[in-house]
Regions:
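Class I SAM-dependent methyltransferase SAM-binding "motif I" and its flanking Rossmann-like core
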Residues: 130-174
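ATP/nucleoside-binding phosphotransfer catalytic cores, i.e., glycine-rich phosphate-binding loops
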Residues: 180-232
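Glycine-rich beta-strand-to-loop/alpha-helix junction loops that act as flexible
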Residues: 34-39, 132-136, 187
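A glycine- and small-aliphatic-rich helix-loop capping segment at beta-alpha/alpha-beta transitions
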Residues: 46-56, 81, 145-153, 201
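A short secondary-structure junction signal
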Residues: 111-112, 141-146, 194-198
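Ligand-binding beta-strand-loop-alpha-helix segment within the catalytic cores
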Residues: 56-131
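Glycine-rich N-terminal segment of FAD-binding domains in flavoprotein oxidoreductases
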Residues: 26-51
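N-terminal glycine-/serine-/threonine-rich phosphate-binding loop
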Residues: 1-32
Length: 232
């Protein structure tokens, strides 16, 4: 487990923001997949302010999502809606660089549309960087324990939250694993126990998608704050 521990969640998101600056200055478009959750909100707020908002060449960055809930962008549950409110409304970014899951659409229709967009824009299925979170149950994106097909050859899948039954669309495990780089951004004391378990137990003996999903030909890393890493 390749872990980097930061003093606070803010330090972790500052590091990611600094890397956005570097990625944005490459001489080709860069495809980044974002995550929902509380720590990414901190990242989006940080990116929307100086110095990052000015230093980043937004025209070069294309944004996607690991998953989203099937709700309209105005719904507080929408991962895309959060980024729009906290980041996109505050910067100049071309509309065509934003590749959202359209949560207001009928799920099967949207699944097909989203897969077509993915195939057209990233024909080899290789993302430059996928930023993921992890729930206390070990899920990542909307890939939940005991209900994820790790061999699904599709690009995306309709998923149902095991408790609320809420419908989402998620990238598949296989698509995520093709990325050049996967960063799990995990913060807070509530994640300490499961991180310890992932560090000390072979992934094949665990039900957690976050323990199993790793970049096949790239880098997999865990950005943690001190609270999350306290048992490691």
């Amino acid at each position: 487990m390749n872990t980097i521990t930061f003093p606070t969640a803010q330090h972790a998101v500052e590091k990611i923001a600094q890397e956005f600056v570097i990625y944005s200055q490459l001489n080709h478009p860069v495809h980044i997949s974002l995550s929902g959750g509380s720590t990414p909100k901190l990242l989006f707020k940080t990116l929307a302010k100086a110095p990052y908002a000015e230093q980043i060449n937004w025209k070069n960055l294309h944004f996607w999502w690991g998953d989203d809930r099937m709700v309209p962008p105005t719904d507080s549950e929408s991962n895309y809606g959060e980024v729009q409110k906290l980041l996109f409304d505050h910067i100049q970014i071309p509309a065509e660089n934003i590749h959202r899951i359209r949560g207001e659409n009928e799920p099967h229709f949207e699944l097909k549309r989203f897969e077509e967009e993915l195939s057209a824009i990233i024909p080899n299925g290789v993302f430059d960087w996928i930023i993921l979170g992890m729930g206390t149950d070990g899920h990542t994106a909307s890939l939940f324990p005991h209900q994820t097909n790790f061999d699904d050859e599709n690009l995306a899948v309709i998923a149902k939250h095991p408790e609320s039954g809420q419908i989402r669309i998620s990238k598949t495990a296989k698509l995520i694993e093709q990325a050049k780089r996967i960063t799990y951004l995990v913060t807070g004391e509530s994640k300490a126990d499961i991180l310890k378990e992932i560090q000390t137990t072979p992934a094949e003996n665990l039900p957690y998608p976050a323990a199993k999903i790793k970049a096949k030909n790239g880098v997999t890393e865990w950005y943690l704050d001190k609270a999350a890493a306290k048992l490691l």
